[in-house]
């Protein structure tokens, strides 16, 4: 009996483990022709040490940075272009050099000149880093490049015999891997897998040839060797080359025998198949699971024909496809559902959602904006559409009984919807006259479930409806309030109280007597948009001016200051000490105790979405549902806290008058003439998530300080006057803070020659000399003039004396 119980428990645990493995969600961020890729069939992917993503296709090489996609092609009249547009393989050596392998040769990328130098004219298909160099696999040939000597030597797998010709294509080297530090496994196209001994420098056949082509060779962390041959499934070998397992469609959960690539990620083998998506294989359980493209499922794998899998140094997983470009695969706890054709269970009947209701069993009823009523079952991850309701705008949903829902339809009033018959029947608020006033006097009646037997119907007036005895009671206020401009709106509810909002006022509703009283109010120019309770006597409040909270103990309102957003559409508190905030089409979380924000973007599972509705009651499950104009958002609140990674910012290029100027930097300083036309500074930002958009803060320091905030990684400076400038930059992180500003470069704008110090100095000296010369000449002339005048004066006096004497002498 105990043995049977143990077996049952083991099987149950294994089933739970297996099912939990299948509950993982993934987001797929895609780059294809629509985003600017030169061609959709991807042959190779590489993320270099600077954070640039390189994509090799059958028609061109592409690089992706924050500035977008740049394409490189072969040009017959340019010796520094690619040898061929067909890219076989990309690799980066230990020195950070980028190598591009094509059928017409191997090229080395010159980053400074942004061009290519062809080093080998033969076709290259693979590579492996070795001590002191890098090896490249060709047809029956390995080219061994040495870093120190910069020379290449050649190794042949099979030597040519005089009487026997070798088919070089059969010995094409598709893959080279290390089983240990002294051995390299060399996988050929048709002639099996060879072992190369690095000490004896000899080849030996390790795994015999297969009738089919070798498509992949991979060694796991536990030293198992996995191979795939075209159409033959998956093979597993031990370290001696002895076969351990052979998995096919007939003897395992593998769904496709055509495996094109293998890699290891998060403890599983990931298998790229030709037509059936990606298979995940867990060696410890011997179980297979699949990621596939599902028509109508926005969050599924983009395409099913996968050519390659690549794990970069940041541990991101990438997939290349036959017709869909590349996509980054990221495990996520947020999933967005969009619309599908009617009765397709993989999506909504209409992506715009305006109401939600969650049952106790976790199923979610969804009111769409024109697509009627939908039902989502989280246990199956499927939707049910109700065609009889298609075309209706369902603005609220509540539960009358296990078999019926109370729904409010835009411009039609309130109805009861039978879950089984899928039909409506009319519902009257008190009597026909009251019903007409509440439904058709310019107000929209909203039915909100606040307790098991109670629904608040809020329109021109507010009513509490008892679902057991089918009675109405008008909800009373503690004093008169002017609700003439709009109706009250329920923002939050639990078993004890509810919260209503109206313009700048927040109201408290006691569940015992359904009385309404003012809780707090803000300035009249501020509108409350959402409220939520965190079970710690705090009412969190979102407004059109930001985030705040009302403390029920101190009866005071406090603001949370942040530059991340200012206009909140919805917020909701989970049971894990977090707020989920929807603002300006973005999603943020706020860890209350740590006062820490986190930004969630499309690679996390949340593309830009205007959230229109969030369910007012806290779920007993681990999910939060948000209804938006771009679909249903499902958040798993078990999401782990993300570690904030500080992005690396570095200078990638400088263009002066459109020409590269990076080489002219000396001691992080450049000199440019005063009459330049254009100056652009280009940045690269290296971070794990290369799709994250960064708000860059440029600081230009001179006699004064200028601040520029932009998402553009290119800073254009076209009108700097003569002087010295220091350019600093910082960017935002995932938690909403900014990095410490770092110096990018010093810029010296030299003035025109007539404004230079040397010219001004010489001019000053010449002015002084000229002035002194003129003064000296003037002095000399004046002195001479005065001397002449003196002589003339003395002569005149002498003449007068002589004349007087002559007059006195008698004749």
Where are these regions (language model features)?
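Intracellular C-terminal tails of type I single-pass membrane proteins
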Residues: 803, 808-811
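Carboxylate-rich, polar loop motifs that coordinate divalent cations or form catalytic acidic clusters
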Residues: 1-750, 755-777
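A short secondary-structure junction motif
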Residues: 657-658, 800, 804
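Cytosolic signal-transmission helices at domain junctions
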Residues: 773-802
């Amino acid at each position: 009996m105990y043995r049977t119980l143990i077996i049952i428990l083991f099987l149950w645990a294994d089933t739970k483990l297996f099912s939990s493995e299948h509950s993982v969600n993934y987001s797929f961020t895609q780059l294809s022709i629509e985003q600017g890729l030169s061609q959709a069939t991807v042959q190779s992917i590489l993320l270099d040490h600077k954070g640039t993503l390189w994509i090799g296709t059958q028609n061109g090489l592409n690089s992706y940075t924050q500035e977008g996609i740049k394409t490189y092609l072969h040009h017959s009249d340019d010796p520094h272009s690619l040898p061929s547009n067909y890219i076989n393989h990309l690799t980066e050596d230990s020195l950070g050099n980028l190598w591009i392998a094509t059928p017409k040769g191997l090229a080395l990328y010159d980053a400074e000149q942004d061009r290519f130098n062809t080093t080998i004219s033969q076709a290259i298909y693979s590579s492996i880093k070795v001590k002191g160099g890098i090896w490249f696999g060709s047809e029956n040939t390995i080219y061994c490049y040495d870093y120190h000597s910069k020379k290449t030597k050649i190794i042949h797998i099979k030597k040519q015999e005089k009487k026997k010709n070798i088919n070089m294509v059969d010995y094409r080297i598709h893959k080279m891997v290390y089983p240990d530090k002294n051995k390299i496994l060399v996988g050929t196209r048709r002639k099996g897998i060879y072992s190369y001994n690095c000490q004896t420098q000899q080849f030996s056949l390790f795994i015999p040839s297969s009738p089919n082509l070798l498509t992949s060779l991979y060694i796991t962390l536990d030293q198992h060797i996995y191979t795939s041959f075209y159409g033959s499934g998956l093979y597993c070998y031990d370290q001696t080359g002895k076969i351990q397992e052979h998995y096919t469609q007939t003897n395992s959960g593998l769904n496709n025998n055509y495996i094109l690539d293998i890699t290891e990620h998060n403890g599983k083998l990931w298998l790229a198949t030709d037509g059936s998506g990606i298979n995940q294989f867990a060696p410890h359980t011997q179980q297979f699971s699949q990621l596939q493209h599902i028509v109508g499922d926005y969050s599924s794998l983009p395409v099913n024909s996968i050519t390659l899998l690549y794990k970069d140094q940041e541990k991101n997983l990438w997939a290349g496809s036959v017709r869909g470009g590349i996509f980054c695969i990221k495990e996520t706890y947020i999933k967005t559902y969009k619309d599908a054709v009617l009765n397709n269970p993989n999506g909504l009947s209409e992506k715009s959602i305006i109401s939600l209701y969650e049952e106790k069993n976790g199923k979610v009823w969804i009111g769409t904006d024109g697509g009627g009523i939908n039902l989502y079952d989280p246990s199956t991850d499927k939707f049910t559409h109700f065609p009889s309701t298609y075309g209706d705008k369902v603005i609220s949903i509540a539960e009358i009984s296990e078999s019926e829902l109370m729904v409010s339809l835009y411009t039609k009033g309130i109805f009861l919807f039978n879950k089984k018959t899928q039909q409506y029947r009319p519902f009257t608020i008190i009597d026909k006259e009251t019903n007409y006033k509440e439904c058709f006097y310019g107000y929209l009646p909203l039915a909100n479930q606040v307790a098991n037997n109670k629904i608040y119907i809020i329109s021109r007036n507010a009513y509490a409806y008892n679902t057991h005895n089918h009675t109405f009671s008008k909800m009373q206020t503690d004093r008169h309030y002017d609700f003439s401009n709009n109706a009250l709106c329920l923002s939050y509810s639990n078993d004890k109280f509810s919260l209503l909002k109206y313009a700048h006022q927040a109201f408290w509703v006691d569940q015992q007597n359904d009385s309404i009283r003012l809780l707090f109010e803000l300035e009249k120019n501020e509108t409350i948009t959402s409220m939520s309770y965190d079970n710690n006597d705090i009412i969190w409040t979102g407004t059109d001016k930001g985030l705040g909270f009302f403390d029920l103990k101190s009866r005071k309102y406090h603001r949370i200051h942040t530059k991340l957003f200012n206009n909140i559409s919805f917020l909701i508190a989970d049971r894990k000490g977090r707020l989920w905030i929807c603002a300006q089409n973005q999603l943020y979380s706020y860890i209350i105790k740590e006062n820490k924000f986190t930004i969630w973007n499309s690679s996390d599972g949340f593309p830009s979405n205007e959230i229109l509705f969030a369910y007012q009651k806290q779920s007993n499950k681990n999910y939060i549902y948000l209804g938006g104009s771009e679909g249903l958002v499902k958040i798993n609140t078990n999401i782990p806290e993300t570690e904030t990674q500080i992005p690396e910012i570095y200078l990638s290029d400088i263009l002066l008058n459109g020409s590269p100027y990076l080489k002219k930097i000396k001691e992080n300083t450049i000199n440019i003439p005063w009459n330049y036309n254009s100056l652009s500074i280009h940045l690269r930002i290296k971070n794990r998530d290369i799709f994250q958009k960064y708000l860059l803060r440029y600081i230009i320091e001179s006699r004064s300080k200028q601040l520029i905030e932009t998402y553009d990684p290119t800073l254009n400076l076209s009108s700097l006057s003569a002087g010295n400038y220091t350019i600093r930059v910082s960017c935002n992180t995932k938690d909403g803070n900014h990095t410490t500003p770092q110096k990018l470069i010093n810029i010296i704008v030299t003035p025109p020659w007539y404004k230079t110090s040397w010219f001004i100095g010489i001019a000053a000296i010449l002015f002084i000399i000229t002035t002194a010369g003129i003064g000296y000449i003037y002095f000399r002339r004046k002195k001479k003039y005065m001397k002449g005048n003196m002589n003339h004066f003395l002569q005149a006096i002498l003449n007068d004396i002589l004349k007087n004497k002559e007059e006195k002498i008698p004749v």
